Amino acid sequence: EEQDIRSMGGVWKKIPYTYILMIIGTLALTGFPFLSGYYSKDAIIEFAYLKGSTVGYYAAAVGIFTALLTSIYSWRLIFKTFHGKYNNKKNNLSSIQESPLIMLIPSCLLAIGAIITGILFKEIFIGSETGFWNNSILFLQITQHDHAPTWLLIITPLIVIVTIPIAYYLFVKNEGILKNAVLKNQLLYNFLINKWYFDDLYNFIFVEPIK
């Protein structure tokens, strides 16, 4: 079975149910408004910012940046897999079939959870009903109450929405932009594609000496 998304593309019409379920999962993962991932991601960034310290501001900035990266690579997966031109030279497009019910039914349940659990349980986990946790989480007496600035409330949903057309343009409509960027920054590309060479370093320090 093919696992390289570079050898896929243009298959959404062949597996429409899988495509729709993947879209729902991606929207939830990236923190699209009112889906399950939106409430947790937004709360983490808000709490970090409202810490009011250098570390808190730094953590919020990192959270926003990682939200951007998550959205880009998640939509890259969608567009490279389901859109664009079919690139698999081993298997014909006609051979691709929808997943069986034994896979679709659990996926549908997960998709339903991604849609409704955030709305249903947000008050229990991060809202006014946090008494659900009883004595497992203890708070000191509240002396002041802060509100997150408006820009912080809208920046994550804005990133999620804006990166969808950007990712489509970069990974489907005009892939040449990224290919040219790779050619011009080959050293950086190799450094990143090799995961900062951590695996090589790990093998050199820990694995090779004990062989």
Model-derived features: where do they sit?
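Alpha-helical multi-pass transmembrane bundles of energy-transducing inner-membrane proteins
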Residues: 1-5
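Membrane-interface segments at transmembrane helix junctions and kinks
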Residues: 7-20, 39-66, 88-211
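Transmembrane alpha-helix interface/packing and boundary motifs in multi-pass membrane proteins
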Residues: 25-34
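Acidic glycine-/aspartate-rich tracts in secreted/extracellular proteins
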Residues: 27, 85-88
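Residue-level hotspots within pore-lining transmembrane alpha-helices
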Residues: 28, 66-69
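Residue-level signal for the membrane-embedded core of alpha-helical transmembrane segments
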Residues: 69-76
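Membrane-spanning helices that line or support transport/gating and their immediate boundary helices
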Residues: 77-81
